[in-house]
């Protein structure tokens, strides 16, 4: 029997020999103990470190960031789930009607090889309690559930951890989940069934979880909710183990069907099935100890005509189940460790980058706040300077601001060319009108300067509004870029961000107005038709040479009338002058307007904004106001730091793990 320290006493006939999991093996009590000690030593070296590693990561809270290898125990109500866990752990867990397990229970079993003392520990939230007697476990778990989930019948997703260290338990960690319920009873929430399934699915959905499905032998396995849920998340059965309970309640004549299920012939699972017989309610009333129940279980299978074969195949009894679960868990851990290490590394890098967005904590001391604000403003000004110099960092699929502005300037050149081309259509009508109505004593071919002046002024005037439109386009682009930099640097400081955004807006209106004034002034000056004599003469010469070359390639046809010849001669002459002047005007306008925009909207805008930001440092009384963080920023930074700390510790532990 088990004494107050959880030890198996000599009165138990099967206690002379223990399996690796610490449970009695009647068949092996005459074997030599020396090989066993050697095997136990190897087992301890390989098994315990693996389980301890995952348990330590779970204790760090790493499971909040990514899934850890685990065995989750699920079953319908009254499936015998609690009895299986009791048999494995050697301690009594809460029992009763309705939902008994109301919080996920992490059951950490640690086998002690060189100690006889039983030790237990319950921990949840910020509470931790050492337990010295196995009989206290049930009460403490019930207390923990009441604290977390309330006194009623509700459930909670919050974990309770129970650690049991004893020579008579296997090295194993299990997560016990609430039993599946269908109908709310008593003071249970009306949607208790949905809540329970949602909690169970949260665990069994993870690919890192081995699902341990507890099913009574005396029900149709195809109708059990637990197995159905496991099949939904693991249709191939790769990570599901079936546990058949209550074989003593099977109707006579149906034993062969149970054997077929246990031998994986009915509902196939790659990890197979195990069958166990745990303490029933009558055994508990008769005060049958867990150790005595294990011996009764073995006797049951040895003497049963149908189920004996399952014992011989290693598919029956709690000790065999413990060995299988430990073996499966270790294999699963070793298989997932490389992936887990990569996931932790990737998460660590991702959170490190995310934390950079939130910057450092605001200092408490006033003089430190000044340096902190200076550092923030200097970083902002550096980013603004990089932007106006065309040296800012951009992503792979992004373009620098100056590249976008240059594209607008290129469009401007195209607009100038298009406007001049469209203007030529009006020239024919202008000259024809002059020739037919207003030509006086002038001989054919003499250009009327006034006509030339009117045409060129009108063409240039039509470019004024497109130039102003381009100014507004570029201004909006620069303002948006400055605002993005402000958000990147000051997003967590609402007042500082709002102040900076206000400065960006005010300076924009001021300089955009000045730039527009300069552009309109330029177009007013362009209404004076002027070009340096030598510059114009060279331009006219180039045009005439080009026209002469084109004429050589054409056949000269005689005109039918003098009037047509007169118009042609006038057109040819005025076109040459228009093209010559247009070349010089185009050079001036296509370059000077972008220069005005660059000066006011990029250089002056950026410089004035940087000076305005530095002026914020002059008023020390506003430091606290400017550096007041958004309500959620500090919490988010703290949350990210905690995650980063967890993952950093996890990386160190994985690095030290011998593998």
Curated annotation (Swiss-Prot):
Primary localization class, coarse: cytoplasm
Any one GO cellular component localisation term in the record: nucleus
Region (Stalk): 365-629
Chain intervals for the UniProt region annotation (Middle domain): 364-531
Domain GED, first and last residues per copy: 571-659
Keyword Acetylation listed: yes
Ranges for region Disordered: 1-40
Protein name: Interferon-induced GTP-binding protein Mx1
Domain remarks in the Swiss-Prot or TrEMBL record: The C-terminal GTPase effector domain (GED) is involved in oligomerization and viral target recognition. The middle domain mediates self-assembly and oligomerization.
Subcellular location: Cytoplasm; Endoplasmic reticulum membrane; Cytoplasm, Perinuclear region
One Pfam family linked to the record: Dynamin_N
Region (G2 motif): 100-102
Region span, G1 motif: 75-82
G5 motif: annotated span: 277-280
Molecular functions per Gene Ontology: GTP binding; GTPase activity; microtubule binding
Complexes and interactors: Homooligomer. Oligomerizes into multimeric filamentous or ring-like structures by virtue of its stalk domain. Oligomerization is critical for GTPase activity, protein stability, and recognition of viral target structures. Interacts with TRPC1, TRPC3, TRPC4, TRPC5, TRPC6 and TRPC7. Interacts with HSPA5. Interacts with TUBB/TUBB5. Interacts with DDX39A and DDX39B.
Region feature (Critical for lipid-binding): 552-555
Gene for this chain: MX1
């Amino acid at each position: 029997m088990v004494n107050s320290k959880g030890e198996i006493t000599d009165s138990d006939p099967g206690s002379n020999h223990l399996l690796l999991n610490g449970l009695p093996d009647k068949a092996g009590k005459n074997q030599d103990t020396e090989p066993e000690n050697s095997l136990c030593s190897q087992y301890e070296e390989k098994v315990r470190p693996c389980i301890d590693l995952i348990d330590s990561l779970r204790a760090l809270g790493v499971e909040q960031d990514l899934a850890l290898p685990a065995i989750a125990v699920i079953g319908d109500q009254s499936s015998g789930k609690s009895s299986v866990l009791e048999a494995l752990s050697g301690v009594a867990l809460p029992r009763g009607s309705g939902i008994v397990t109301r919080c996920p229970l992490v059951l950490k079993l640690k086998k002690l090889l060189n100690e006889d003392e039983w030790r237990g520990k319950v921990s949840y939230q910020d509470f931790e309690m050492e337990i010295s007697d196995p009989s206290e476990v049930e009460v403490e778990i019930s207390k923990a559930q009441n604290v977390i989930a309330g006194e009623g019948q509700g459930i909670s997703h919050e974990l309770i951890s129970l650690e049991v260290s004893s020579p008579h338990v296997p090295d194993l960690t299990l997560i016990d989940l609430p039993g599946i319920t269908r109908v709310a009873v008593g003071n249970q929430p009306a949607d208790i069934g949905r809540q329970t399934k949602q909690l169970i699915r949260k665990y069994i959905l993870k690919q890192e979880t081995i699902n341990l499905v507890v099913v009574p032998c005396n029900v149709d396995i195809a109708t059990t909710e637990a197995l159905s849920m496991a099949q939904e998340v693991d249709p191939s059965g790769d990570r599901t183990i079936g546990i058949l309970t209550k074989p003593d309640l099977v109707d006579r004549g149906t034993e062969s069907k149970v054997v077929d299920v246990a031998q994986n012939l009915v509902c196939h699972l790659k990890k197979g099935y195990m069958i166990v017989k745990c303490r029933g309610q009558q055994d508990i009333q008769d005060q049958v100890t867990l150790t005595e129940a294990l011996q009764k279980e073995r006797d049951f299978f040895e003497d049963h005509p149908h189920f004996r074969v399952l014992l011989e195949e290693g598919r029956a009894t709690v000790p065999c189940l413990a060995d299988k679960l430990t073996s499966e868990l270790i294999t699963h851990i070793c298989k997932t460790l490389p992936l887990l290490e990569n996931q932790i590394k990737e998460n660590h890098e991702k959170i490190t980058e995310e934390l950079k967005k939130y910057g450092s904590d605001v200092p408490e001391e006033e003089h430190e706040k000044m340096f902190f604000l200076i550092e923030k403003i200097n970083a902002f000004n550096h980013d603004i300077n990089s932007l106006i110099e065309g040296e800012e960092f951009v992503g792979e699929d992004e373009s620098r601001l100056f590249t976008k502005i240059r594209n607008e300037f290129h469009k401007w050149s195209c607009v100038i060319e298009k406007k001049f081309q469209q203007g030529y259509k009006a020239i024919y009508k202008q000259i024809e009108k002059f020739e037919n109505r207003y030509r006086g004593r002038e001989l054919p071919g003499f250009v009327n300067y006034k006509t030339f002046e009117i045409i060129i002024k009108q063409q240039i005037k039509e470019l004024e509004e497109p130039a102003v439109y381009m100014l507004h386009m570029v201004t909006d682009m620069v303002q948006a870029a400055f605002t993005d930099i402000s958000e990147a640097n000051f997003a967590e400081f609402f007042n500082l961000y709002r102040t900076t955004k206000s400065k960006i807006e005010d300076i924009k209106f001021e300089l955009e107005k000045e730039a527009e004034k300069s552009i309109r002034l330029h177009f007013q000056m362009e209404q004076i038709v002027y070009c340096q004599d030598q510059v114009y003469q060279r331009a006219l010469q180039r045009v005439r040479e080009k026209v002469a070359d084109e004429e050589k390639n054409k056949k000269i046809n005689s005109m039918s009338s003098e009037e047509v010849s007169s118009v042609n001669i006038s057109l040819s002459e005025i076109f040459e002058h228009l093209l010559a002047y247009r070349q010089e005007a185009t050079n001036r306008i296509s370059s000077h307007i972008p220069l005005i925009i660059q000066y006011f909207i990029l250089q002056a805008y950026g410089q004035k904004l940087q000076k305005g930001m530095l002026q914020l440092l002059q008023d020390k009384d506003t430091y606290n106001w400017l550096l007041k963080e958004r309500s959620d920023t500090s919490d988010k930074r703290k949350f990210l730091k905690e995650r980063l700390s967890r993952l950093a510790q996890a990386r160190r532990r994985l690095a030290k793990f011998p593998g």
